[in-house]
Amino acid sequence: MPTLKDIRVRIKGVTSTQQVTKAMKMVAAAKLRRAQERAVMARPYAAKLSEMLGSLSAKVDTSENPLLSGRSEVRGALVILITSDRGLCGGFNTNIIKVAQRVVNNEYGELNAAGRLSMICAGTRGFDFFRKRGYTILKGYPSVFQNLDFSTAQEIAETASSMYLKGEVDKVVVVYNEFKSVLAPVLKAETLLPISSEENEGDRGGDYIYEPSPSAIISELVPKHLNTQVWRMMLESNAAEQAARMTAMDSATENAKELLRTLNISYNRARQAAITKELSEIVGGADALQN
């Protein structure tokens, strides 16, 4: 049975931990508000770019732009994984890494075994996980979310499009957490290249005169579209991470609160038992003196 001193030490340790988790929850909540605002603001712009691209591509031969036309055979693939830099965010990283493993080992298992699958990892957790297991990591961006910048998304998009145009890969997939609500991020494995036919469906109802030609506009629009999509995915992942961390720290704080309640009950019982024992010894000693 633990002594009063042991219980006091545990109470002190749990109280200290509770203060840390409560502070981390508050920090995550503040970061979530900013991250959510950025993600929500990026969505309409990304959606409008996709719509414009779809409207224009309906009026031209998509074979003129290789990024808009798929290939009959996938002989090489690139998987872009977006995770967090830090832990203490529940199953945020574990769940998305499982999705990435499924994509790499199941959907493109033959390409991976043949050495024709590469990865780009944005975020320390995913980078460390796949690097230690010997996967081919073309580029890693550890600690990218410490100072999230559009130039990183642009660099990733340019690398992906360059590899696709050179024929080094025939498919580019992005695996990330999409922010939907605080309690329910959505695990996504989304094709970035080739730009899917669904994205090319845009508004076909309007009849516009384009200056310069639709083909020239598409050539300018496609890189912007790719940059924006990667940036949106990184913002979504960042917001989902902060939401997961806030939820995890809230749960940890509540667990600490419940543990403190149990420890205080144990402490009071142990203290009561010690007092009862002392009283019994005093009474026993007094009886012995009287006899």
Curated annotation (Swiss-Prot):
It is a peripheral membrane protein. GO terms for cellular component: plasma membrane; proton-transporting ATP synthase complex. Its main location: membrane. Keywords: ATP synthesis, Cell inner membrane, Cell membrane, CF(1), Hydrogen ion transport, Ion transport, Membrane, Transport. CDD domains: F1-ATPase_gamma (cd12151). InterPro entries: ATP_synth_F1_ATPase_gsu, ATP_synth_F1_gsu, ATP_synth_F1_gsu_CS. GO terms for biological process: proton motive force-driven plasma membrane ATP synthesis. Disulfide bonds: none annotated. It is found in: Cell inner membrane. One of its GO terms (molecular function) is proton-transporting ATP synthase activity, rotational mechanism. F-type ATPases have 2 components, CF(1) - the catalytic core - and CF(0) - the membrane proton channel. CF(1) has five subunits: alpha(3), beta(3), gamma(1), delta(1), epsilon(1). CF(0) has three main subunits: a, b and c. Belongs to the ATPase gamma chain family. This is ATP synthase gamma chain. It comes from Chlorobium phaeovibrioides (strain DSM 265 / 1930) (Prosthecochloris vibrioformis (strain DSM 265)).
